[in-house]
């Protein structure tokens, strides 16, 4: 008889954007996109969902470790190029992407075993969601943390806005999210954002030692302790995550994400002055070319943005 909950070997899974291994009661999920600083695409999320579900159901797994490939980045958040190519054009796809992201985060947080974030490089933007979602975190001493959302037209509302104040305090959370300045691994340690900082060459040894200690917990007691410890995170998450998903979807068609993401891709500063100047002058700063209120008297086309001087349908100069 087929046993639906039987243990599956890690080699059974054919992942492309993550590495998945199970060894000595520890399951390790590695974001394997170092060429884009381990940014997370929709494909990455699908694979993470499958890996976390397997780790949750595998009774031989006692600890789950999440890390990134290489030594440059743990995770840089969502894939900016995918955002520009997919979500700016079709916001409904961003809603779908966020659904995958929320599912993956939920599975990781409720995997039923202690979780460890092995921070091997920069933790940027929504990458900090995954650090905050883990029970414990060990960082290499070269790691830097930075929240860039408000400068690239996004809000990191998939965990960071909800959980960062609970972990480091409200003032420090506001400092990270609104100032957008880097903080070092040592500063993160002093703030309680990580549990330990070690030289990069000692990172695996430290993570393995922590995992060996966590294995000694009785599994049901550890699972329920995690459930109780997650109360405030669960409460904040339940009250805001769905709202954030919808608002970020609607906002993805606005000028701010267009300018912010494009500036990030072009590796240039965000032109926040133009957005502020148009608003100060009484124009629409929410839309790239202004509100779609103009009409062409020549062909009758409607819904033309205020910033257009010519009709996009017939080419006539607008009155």
What are the roles of these predicted feature ranges?
Residues 1-67, 285-287, 292, 298:
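Conserved CoA-thioester-binding segment of acyl-CoA-metabolizing enzymes
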Residues 34, 138-143, 194-242, 255, ...:
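C-terminal long alpha-helix characteristic of the crotonase
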Residues 296-299, 311-314:
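Short cysteine-rich clusters marking metal-coordination/redox-active sites
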Residues 302, 317:
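Cys/His-rich metal-chelating microdomains
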Residues 24-32, 46-88, 107-117, 140-144:
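A structural preference for short, pocket-lining loop segments at secondary-structure junctions
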Residues 5, 12, 68-104, 123, ...:
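Glycine- (often His-adjacent) and acidic-residue-rich active-site loop
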Residues 74, 305-310:
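Short Cys/His-rich "knuckle" micro-motifs
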Residues 106-219:
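Crotonase-fold acyl-CoA enzyme core
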């Amino acid at each position: 008889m087929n046993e639906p909950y039987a243990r599956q070997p890690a080699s059974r899974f054919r992942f492309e954007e993550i590495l998945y291994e199970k060894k000595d009661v520890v399951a390790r999920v590695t974001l394997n996109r170092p060429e884009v600083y381990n940014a997370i695409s929709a494909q990455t999320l699908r694979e993470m969902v499958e890996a976390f579900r397997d780790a949750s159901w595998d009774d031989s797994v006692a600890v789950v470790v999440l890390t990134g490939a290489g030594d440059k980045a743990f995770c840089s958040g969502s894939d900016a190029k995918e955002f520009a190519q997919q979500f700016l054009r079709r916001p409904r796809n961003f809603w779908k992407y966020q659904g995958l992201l929320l599912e993956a985060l939920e599975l990781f947080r409720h995997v039923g075993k202690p979780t460890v974030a092995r921070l091997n490089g920069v933790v940027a933007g929504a990458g900090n969601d995954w650090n905050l979602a883990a029970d414990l975190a060990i960082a290499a001493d070269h790691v830097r943390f930075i929240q860039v959302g408000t400068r690239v037209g996004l809000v990191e509302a998939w965990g960071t806005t909800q959980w960062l104040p609970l972990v480091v305090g409200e003032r420090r959370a506001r400092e990270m999210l609104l100032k957008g300045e880097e903080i070092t691994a040592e500063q993160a340690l002093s703030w309680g954002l990580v549990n330990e900082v070690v030289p990069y060459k000692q990172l695996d040894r430290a993570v393995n030692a922590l995992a060996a200690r966590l294995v000694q917990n009785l599994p049901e007691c550890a699972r329920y302790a995690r459930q109780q410890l997650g109360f405030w995170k669960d409460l904040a998450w339940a009250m805001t995550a769905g709202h954030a998903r919808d608002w970020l979807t609607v906002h993805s068609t606005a000028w701010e994400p267009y300018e912010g993401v494009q500036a990030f891709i072009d590796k240039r500063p965000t032109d926040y002055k133009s957005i502020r100047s148009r608003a100060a002058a009484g124009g629409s700063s929410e839309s790239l070319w202004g509100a779609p209120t103009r009409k062409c008297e020549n062909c009758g086309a409607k819904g033309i943005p205020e910033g257009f001087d010519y009709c996009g349908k017939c080419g006539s100069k607008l009155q």
